């Protein structure tokens, strides 16, 4: 691979991921080795190998407990987080608790292994990086990665860590709607005049985000964000799955709900049906031998699908109303509505949204699956100093999704940075002691919108000690909140009289990985990658031996060559070929060297015989090489 490639933009999605690059003045969304422009965010572990992307998703029905998806729902969260606990009920794979952090447990090559969500996400990112490298023919080292607008600090940090484990320099973590707005801003560049309010409606496979941005003179500013971390195509599929499990029970008096493989196959068929129903009014489901040998054939109309999900579809308008309230805008003040995420293709959702905005046209000009990666690729080019005129006058302002503050007397939340403040930002406020001769203060940092800290989320805390004795209210303690462009928070406190300072970067208290953890994971990621490559080479050597063996067998058995070869030679070749075929059947897992050694032995025996044979047959083509290699068919 020659030279250093450009920076890439990665949309690391809950269910699918997408990668783009900005070059030659335009964005290119890159297809993977299967020709798909989005790649499932799935990682599977088997007895012999690790699979990522389409290959992992395609075998999920056979291997549900060792196929990991939805890592984005775990990343940066604690094990006892209520959302983690409720998600665990629905996942076929095991999640275990290690020091308060969730880890997924799988069986890999016959051993029990556990992985942090960051490691699983890093495997998906590695796949996306490789997709880009294969297309560009260059090493890729830098990237911009996107996250949902209301990911908190630890979720952003953990996503950045996943990039680091992959070996990427993550220049910036940006919000998904901001990325979509950039993509959109470029698309609509020629027509801009004055300030525009844009609503971004992003309904993906697993999450739903609504954001309102203003765009003026190339400056994007996020005004508000709202949404539901648990709404998307998967939920619509689940409604169909439940419906069909009941139908199967009714028709066949059998309950297949407890059979993971049957449910998984049913879910895959439902996902296909949902996609079909966006363009057709009816979809059929045909699954052979779904459960206990019974075939399941049924169909679903678009109207029935809409009825099953009526409450969920209608529910998408609540976050729209909340985002409008937060941005202090009336729905009539929204100039543009942008659709992002595959589920926005559902006609009913488009209709509900259009009716809510009194028939306003929706923007569907960008492929909804690709808009976020598109914007991330543009942002990567800007940060790398791309001088192309298409990106020159774009500036990007992001916001903090939640208010940040400290606890003051009586458990009151005192916010220093209000939610939806443009970042980077720095705010300072002076506090004092609560009792006489108080020698230390505890600074507790919270995020959230409630009046009392007990209802908000504790990010971290530290003590400022050594305050000289004084009556209450006299010491002056200056607290500073500083958020950088990635949304990462530093909090410091200084005692004005002594100049004593203490500070915290909000990371570890939220279960962030330590530097040692990350370094170890980087090494492990490299080890797994090397194992994957060794396995590919091993399979290649096995296929080569197999194809050469069958080739030789065919050659000496060829009717046309009868009489050109002595029976003794023919028997020699056939015996040796049979010996190789038997050993291949017995041991599918031999080392590459063993396969190569067997092939050399076989060639040593066959080459002189084949050469004689073809000379005898008037040089009917050289057969002495390794025989044709067989291309893999997926």
UniProtKB/Swiss-Prot annotation:
Q: Which UniProt keywords apply?
A: ATP-binding, Nucleotide-binding, Stress response
Gene Ontology terms: biological process: chaperone cofactor-dependent protein refolding; protein refolding; response to cold; response to heat; response to progesterone
Biological function: Molecular chaperone implicated in a wide variety of cellular processes, including protection of the proteome from stress, folding and transport of newly synthesized polypeptides, activation of proteolysis of misfolded proteins and the formation and dissociation of protein complexes. Plays a pivotal role in the protein quality control system, ensuring the correct folding of proteins, the re-folding of misfolded proteins and controlling the targeting of proteins for subsequent degradation. This is achieved through cycles of ATP binding, ATP hydrolysis and ADP release, mediated by co-chaperones.
Q: Where are the transmembrane segments?
A: none
Q: Which Pfam families match?
A: HSP70
Identify the PANTHER family for this entry: HEAT SHOCK PROTEIN 70KDA
Indicate the family of this protein.
Answer: Belongs to the heat shock protein 70 family.
Provide a Gene Ontology MF annotation, just one: ATP hydrolysis activity
Report the GO terms under cellular component: cytoplasm; cytosol; nucleus; perikaryon; plasma membrane; receptor complex
Annotated domain remarks: The N-terminal nucleotide binding domain (NBD) (also known as the ATPase domain) is responsible for binding and hydrolyzing ATP. The C-terminal substrate-binding domain (SBD) (also known as peptide-binding domain) binds to the client/substrate proteins. The two domains are allosterically coupled so that, when ATP is bound to the NBD, the SBD binds relatively weakly to clients. When ADP is bound in the NBD, a conformational change enhances the affinity of the SBD for client proteins.
In its UniProt entry, what is this protein called? Heat shock 70 kDa protein
Give the matching NCBIfam families: PRK00290.1 (NF001413)
List every stretch annotated Substrate-binding domain (SBD).
Answer: 397-512
Q: Where is this region: Nucleotide-binding domain (NBD)?
A: 3-389
Q: Which InterPro entries match?
A: ATPase_NBD (IPR043129), Heat_shock_70_CS (IPR018181), HSP70_C_sf (IPR029048), HSP70_peptide-bd_sf (IPR029047), Hsp_70_fam (IPR013126)
